Amino acid sequence: MSGSSPKSISISGVETDITIGKELAAVAQKSKALASRDCFEQLEMYLHGRSHDRVCLLFGLLQTGKNTMLRQAIGRMTKEDLSRIAYIKARRTDNMAMMNRDLKKLFNAGFRYVFIDEVTLMEDFIDSAALFSDVFATMGMKIVLSGTDSLGFWLAMDEELYDRAKSIHTTFIPYREYSRLLGIDS
């Protein structure tokens, strides 16, 4: 498959908002030319590291680069890996049972990288977040959970994801990084 464009794979019966294949590649393409946050390397290390029992939490205030980092990480994947990536936009109406069923379908279809945006919108996330690390990460999936609810992530890390998550907090942006990202001479 190397050298070919990513396939748009249809997964029937999914309950969550999943983007894969050509649509995902098109979204990721828009972020390739943007400068990366200093903490981007931590995300890359998680995605390409050997750890298979942890998830990655990417959280912080609005407009601090979380979605751009997700798209940049997806855009830097090989074409082979791109065919194994799914992006899920969590909604308030989603729950962990739905997510569990869809992640099983994705795993069985060969997906190994899953980016779940605004995961804390799900009402039962905090009480059942270990599903991501204890089941799917140990099966070999790299799962990145992102969102703006820092308290929700902190509560999940304190309970369900204790010692099972790599956290990347994007809220603090040093002036040197800010000026580099925006091309401001200081």
Where are these regions (language model features)?
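Walker A/P-loop nucleotide-binding motif
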Residues: 52-71
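Sensor-1/coupling segment of RecA-like P-loop NTPase cores
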Residues: 135-157
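P-loop NTPase Walker A phosphate-binding motif
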Residues: 67-82
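Catalytic P-loop NTPase motifs of RecA-like helicase/translocase cores
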Residues: 94, 121-124, 152-153
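A short, basic N-terminal segment
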Residues: 1-52
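Interdomain motor-coupling "hinge/lid" segment immediately C-terminal to the ATP-binding subdomain
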Residues: 153-186
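Short glycine-rich substrate-engagement loop in P-loop NTPases that contacts/grips substrate
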Residues: 82-110
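Conserved P-loop NTPase "ATPase switch" module shared by AAA+ and STAND
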Residues: 107-128
